[in-house]
């Protein structure tokens, strides 16, 4: 009996230790198709490798939050880190700047990654 109690306590301690591991998100911003000015496309922000799961992600046009942004369900990898895809339809042109802003407990403040149309 005491052995099973000890194993249960050990299991709970090891599970609670999983929450202590914090991982910084990797942020990738890209379009679904090669960009052509004036042609509709999709802007994607793939955020991966982060832990814990609480995260804020915004797609930006000229520094302002874009509307009608959708996202995938929160998923996790084999290493128990999380990943998400945020996306929205947009029409690229030469004058507008697009970016993805992410805020997570592992960051000192929000991190913004600009979309590079040449990627």
Curated annotation (Swiss-Prot):
The keyword Signal applies. One of its GO terms (biological process) is peptide antigen assembly with MHC class II protein complex. InterPro entries: B2Microglobulin, Ig-like_dom, Ig-like_dom_sf, Ig-like_fold, Ig/MHC_CS, Ig_C1-set, MHC/Immunoglobulin. It is found in: Secreted. Disulfide bonds join 45-100. Heterodimer of an alpha chain and a beta chain. Beta-2-microglobulin is the beta-chain of major histocompatibility complex class I molecules. This is Beta-2-microglobulin.
């Amino acid at each position: 009996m005491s052995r099973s109690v000890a194993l249960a306590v050990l299991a709970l301690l090891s599970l609670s230790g999983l929450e202590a591991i914090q991982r910084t998100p990797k942020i990738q911003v890209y379009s679904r198709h090669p960009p052509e000015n004036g042609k509709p496309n999709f802007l994607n922000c793939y955020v991966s490798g982060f832990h814990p799961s609480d995260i804020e992600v915004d797609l930006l046009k000229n520094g302002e939050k874009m509307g009608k942004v959708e996202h995938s369900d929160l998923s996790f990898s084999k290493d128990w880190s999380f990943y998400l895809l945020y996306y929205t339809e947009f029409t690229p042109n030469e004058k507008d700047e697009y970016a993805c802003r992410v805020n997570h407990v592992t960051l000192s403040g929000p991190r913004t990654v600009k979309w590079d149309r040449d990627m």
